A protein has these predicted regions:
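Double-stranded RNA-binding/processing signature
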Residues: 1-200, 204
Length: 207
């Protein structure tokens, strides 16, 4: 009996609550390099990652909307982007201890910089399916925002859109090239760079 209870206890320590459908959380921690086959389908965390990405964006937007009541859309969008960028999600995943739950091929870990952040998004997707939006938002607020993210501080940090675009390209396996077209000076005498961005077709990996 203890063997059956142990996963629930471990996930309780990670999440702060007992999961109802533990299968969702186990799937959230299953990297594509260790996919399993069930009824002819490959099972891994990619679908949950897709869902969690959207849910996390919505939750962070919700939190920022009520936190910064007079701020404009551009400010809110930039602040959200800084919170959900891949480097931040990787760090949060490690601080939570999520990295200890992920099942993956050892040869994958050496060159997958975003595995932990991707698993974190999958975890958000699992919580949403298991407990609903309100519960998921509470998890983000109490287990992520409150202990690890200073909203006032991060809202004032400069944001590098070029790095964000490169990060997006790496996640979706597309090559991005930048070509400087023109340099001008704005009304405050700051340089403004106009660049042309070329995005290639996604790379399809055979497995």
């Amino acid at each position: 009996m203890l063997r059956h209870k142990e996963p629930y206890v471990l996930y309780r320590k990670l999440l702060g609550f007992y999961p109802t459908d533990i299968y969702l959380y186990e799937q959230a921690c299953l990297h594509r390099s260790s996919s399993i086959c069930e009824q002819g389908r490959r099972i891994n965390n990619e679908r949950l990652e897709f869902l969690g990405d959207a849910i996390l964006d919505a939750i962070v937007a919700d939190i920022l909307f009520h936190k910064f009541k007079t701020s404009k859309e551009g400010f809110l969008t930039n602040t959200r982007a800084k919170i959900v960028k891949r480097e931040s999600l990787n760090e949060i995943a490690v601080k939570l201890g999520l990295d200890n739950f992920i099942t993956y091929s050892m040869r994958t870990s050496s060159h997958n910089n975003y595995m932990f952040g991707n698993a974190f998004e999958a975890l958000i997707g699992a919580i949403y399916l298991d407990k609903g939006y309100r519960y998921c938002k509470k998890f983000v607020e109490t287990r992520i925002i409150d202990p690890y993210i200073d909203l006032e501080k991060i809202s004032k940090e400069e944001f590098n859109f070029k790095s964000r675009l490169i990060e997006w390209g790496q996640k979706h396996k597309v090559d991005i090239e930048f070509a400087l077209i023109e340099t001008i000076v704005d009304q405050d005498n700051n340089p403004v760079f106009l660049s042309l961005i070329h995005i290639s077709e996604p790379t399809r990996l055979l497995s």
